[in-house]
Amino acid sequence: MEEERRLVWRVLRHWKKFVDGGRFPRRDEIDPWLRGEDGKNCLLIALVSPIELSHFVVVGLNLAVALCSTDTLAGLLLSRAPRVASARRGVMIEGGATLRGADILYRSVLLPIAEDGVTIDHVLGATNYRLLREDEPRLRQGVFQTQWI
């Protein structure tokens, strides 16, 4: 089988193997995505109660930011984690954001993770993005498209 070139689709395919088997993957089963080359574009969010106190456990080098307001890519993904947990489904989102002060277009996937296979305790995120070209109009920040998985 040809290797999937897009990180988001590779991570989604790996996650779906577990979900199609009737359970969410455990953290140790997704750790390979948080290491190595792919890990630079991945993050892991710990879900805690109250949900507003959820926080990053791992943020890949390419997604790291000093402050996580919702107009940054990492902050935007963090703000979506509670919806993923309550829906008990993954979500793919596309839109515009700021990464290290630059405008980008992105495609991200947020996927529930459960240590016991049932109770969601983390959300795995993976993101592909590109800088806006100078000849492209500046886009508003936020989500342009959402697809529940």
Please tell me what each predicted stretch does.
Residues 1-68, 75-149:
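Intrinsically disordered, low-complexity terminal regulatory regions
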